[in-house]
């Protein structure tokens, strides 16, 4: 895979984290703007997760039937228009609806990127490519909160969504010019009825389900952190909105670094082995975070240490779980990618909503959900040990 293709796929993969992380510093501002509280603003985040979960179920079969390019172009165009609608939101209800539509467009890049990697790479190479994609898309959670905080303080919250529209427009142009069709020509286009019917077979595929759920609940812990951190950092511990991005970015840097380390680790033992090892690190750091949250330290830094370890470990967990789940999917790579992403973001939406539901003015809800996700990820990863990928 050449560098240009890798960069385009990385940018498309970044739609999800960029559209999430870019507006996180604006949560308190949006609450004041619309005369509500942060917990209700978090519903716009949950709506985005629900949109991604639903949309991926459709893009997968469409990519298997019509190829990778056409559904991708439609999705990126929809994301661009919905971003502009978010910028014009006169109410929180409008913003929540526009975020849902934005997710329906943005998930095209996430689904079809995984399918393209599966088209071009075997399982071991896929694990390495997914780790490299994390490096590209990992710039989003590092730079997005910083940029979002800067735009918030200089141009106001609508500029955040204007910037997302510009980014999506550039990605649309890049796909048109430089990303060819990658679906193997020897594969007959899957009929839509058969493509959607493939979901039943995938749901009964134990290796696919085990590794998909391991990655899904691990990702849910990440999004529990994303949903809870604006309140914990800014409201609970008084971190200025413009400084929030530095703290968020430090954790994201750990995620990116470990993803690059993972590309080397999988050479010895394969992705399944390192998935099982790193979910143990994820669980241990999540439990440590929960204990500290119950202790309620007066300063933020005791919570930041286990948070950093937890997020960094996901740099190994997520690419390996994805590579294992996508192994052997062949003709139905699009459907497999769609179902994988849908399950992951369904769980993520539930986790972010649970953090909001449990809100009690402390860091405990965020920490509890992260610890529970770590335990579930361990269970699914080790249950899947019996399967060879």
In which residue ranges do the predicted regions lie?
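Helix-breaking motifs and short loop linkers at transmembrane-helix boundaries and internal kinks
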Residues: 35, 67, 88-94, 105, ...
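Conserved MFS/SLC helix-loop-helix module at the cytosolic interface between two early adjacent transmembrane helices
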Residues: 54-93
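Structural signature of the two symmetry-related core transmembrane helices
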Residues: 70-84, 274-289
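Paired small-residue
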Residues: 78-85, 93-101, 301-307
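Juxtamembrane intracellular "pre-TM" segments in multi-pass secondary transporters
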Residues: 182-212
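A late C-terminal transmembrane helix in Major Facilitator Superfamily
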Residues: 324-361, 370
């Amino acid at each position: 895979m050449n560098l240009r293709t890798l960069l385009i796929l990385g940018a498309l993969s970044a739609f999800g984290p960029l559209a999430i992380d870019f507006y996180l510093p604006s949560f308190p501002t949006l609450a004041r703007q619309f005369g509500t509280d942060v917990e209700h603003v978090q519903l716009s985040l949950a709506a985005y997760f629900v949109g991604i979960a639903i949309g991926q179920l459709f893009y997968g079969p469409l990519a298997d039937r019509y190829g990778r390019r056409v559904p991708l172009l439609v999705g990126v165009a929809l994301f661009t228009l919905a971003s502009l609608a978010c910028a014009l939101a006169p109410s929180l209800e409008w913003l929540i609806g526009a975020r849902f539509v934005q997710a329906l467009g943005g998930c095209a890049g996430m689904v079809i990127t995984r399918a393209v990697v599966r088209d071009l790479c075997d399982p071991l190479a896929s694990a390495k490519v997914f780790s490299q994609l994390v490096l590209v898309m990992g710039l989003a959670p590092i730079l997005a909160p910083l940029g979002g905080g800067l735009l918030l303080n200089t141009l106001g919250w609508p500029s955040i969504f204007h910037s997302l529209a510009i980014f999506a427009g550039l990605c649309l142009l890049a796909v048109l010019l430089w990303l060819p069709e990658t679906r193997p020509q020897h594969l007959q286009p899957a009929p839509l009825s058969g493509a959607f019917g493939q979901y039943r077979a995938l749901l009964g595929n134990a290796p696919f389900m085990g590794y998909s759920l391991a990655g899904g609940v691990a990702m849910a812990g990440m999004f529990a952190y994303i949903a809870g951190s604006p309140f914990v950092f800014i409201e609970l511990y008084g971190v200025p909105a413009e400084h929030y991005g530095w703290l968020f970015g430090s954790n994201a840097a750990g995620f990116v670094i470990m993803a690059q380390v993972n590309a080397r680790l999988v050479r010895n033992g394969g992705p399944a082995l390192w998935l099982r090892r790193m979910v143990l690190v994820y669980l241990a750091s999540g439990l440590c975070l929960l204990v500290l949250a119950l202790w309620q330290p007066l300063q933020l830094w005791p919570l930041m240490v286990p948070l950093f370890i937890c997020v960094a470990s996901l740099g190994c967990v997520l690419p390996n779980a994805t590579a294992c789940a996508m192994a052997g999917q062949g003709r139905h790579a699009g459907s497999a990618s769609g179902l994988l992403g849908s399950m992951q973001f369904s769980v993520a939406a539930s986790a972010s909503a649970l953090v909001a539901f449990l809100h009690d003015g402390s860091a405990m809800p965020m920490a509890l959900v992260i610890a529970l996700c770590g335990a579930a990820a361990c269970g699914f990863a080790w249950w899947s040990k019996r399967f060879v990928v």
